[in-house]
Structures are given as structure tokens and as C-alpha cells.
């Protein structure tokens, strides 16, 4: 584990959180979830340099035009993110990814940015809304792909 690299990668994530209680408040506004994350022995560790290298390698791979070009164009894609998520650059990165998918010829790309939500939108205080939107999107796309009767 490399503490310096960890601080460089994750150190600024709480920067826009008003009055953070912990170093992990950027994850969600739900304090119970943050506390459970901190208490869990498999969470909150300092990652190895190799893990970060592999993560960056994967991100670079999926961002390549040839990787996007190889995707099945007829598959629908639903990007969801928190508007206060530092990992997704506060919604900007998610919108850029959606634009890249569209430019690659993906026919059905939807984006929903949840204002005030942080990184773990499925663990946010409005998680029911998020799950409801996912269910609605899935239902509408299942209807589109159902065989005609």
C-alpha cells in the first residue's frame, strides 16, 4: 500500500462536502452507510499501487475508440450518477462518457444525474427514487424488446 498515492488519488474527494464527519463522507449523505463502510474490515483500506495501475489500465481500455466501436450498437445504456460525486467529476465525466457512447453509434443512451447525491447513489438517502428510476428504465426497455404478440 502506498499512502502518498492514496492521498493523491482520493485525498480531495471530501473537498466539496460541507463539514465532513469522516474521510469517507464523499461516498453518501447517509451517515449510517458511511459508518458501516468504515466499520467493515474489507472497506477503507489503502490500495496497492498495482490495484490503481490495473484500474487505470481498464479505464484507458474502455475509453479507446476501438473498444467503444466494438460494442453492440442496439443495446440500451443507462448512465446514472450523483451530481455531487467527485469520482465522476460532479456529473461531467458521466455526461462525457454518454457522449462518447453516442459518438460511437450507440442508439439508445440515457443519462440521469441525481443532484446532491454523492458516489454511492444506491446507498443515498433518496435510494428509493434511484431504484424506482432504474426499475422504470428497465421496464420501458423490456417492453421495447418484448416479442410482438
Question: Residue locations for each model-derived region?
Answer:
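Catalytic active-site module of serine/aspartate enzymes centered on a nucleophile-bearing elbow/loop
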Residues: 62, 102-149
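Short, proline-enriched alpha-helix->beta-strand connector loops that line the catalytic pocket
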Residues: 71-77, 104-107
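Active-site nucleophile elbow and catalytic-triad environment of alpha/beta-hydrolase enzymes
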Residues: 43, 48-69
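Conserved alpha/beta-hydrolase "acid-adjacent" motif
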Residues: 86-96
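Alpha/beta-hydrolase-fold enzymes
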Residues: 1-42
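Short beta-strand/loop motif that positions the catalytic acidic residue
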Residues: 79-81
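Alpha-helical elements of Rossmann-like donor-binding domains used by nucleotide-donor carbohydrate transfer enzymes
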Residues: 36, 54-57, 96, 129, ...
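Acidic beta-to-alpha connecting loop that harbors the catalytic carboxylate
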Residues: 83-86, 117-118
Amino acid at each position: 500500500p502506498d499512502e502518498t498515492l492514496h492521498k493523491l488519488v482520493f485525498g480531495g474527494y471530501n473537498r466539496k462536502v460541507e463539514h465532513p464527519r469522516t474521510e469517507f463522507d464523499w461516498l453518501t449523505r447517509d451517515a449510517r452507510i458511511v459508518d458501516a463502510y468504515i466499520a467493515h474490515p474489507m472497506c477503507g483500506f489503502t490500495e496497492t499501487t498495482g490495484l490503481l495501475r490495473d484500474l487505470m489500465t481498464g479505464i484507458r481500455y474502455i475509453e479507446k475508440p476501438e473498444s467503444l466501436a466494438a460494442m453492440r450498437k442496439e443495446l440500451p445504456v443507462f448512465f446514472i450518477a450523483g451530481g455531487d460525486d467527485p469520482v465522476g467529476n460532479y456529473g461531467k465525466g458521466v455526461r462525457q462518457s454518454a457522449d462518447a457512447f453516442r459518438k460511437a453509434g450507440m442508439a439508445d443512451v440515457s443519462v440521469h444525474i441525481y443532484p446532491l447525491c454523492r458516489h454511492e447513489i444506491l446507498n443515498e438517502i433518496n435510494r428509493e427514487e434511484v431504484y424506482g428510476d432504474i426499475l422504470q428504465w428497465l421496464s420501458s426497455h423490456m417492453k421495447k424488446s418484448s416479442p410482438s404478440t
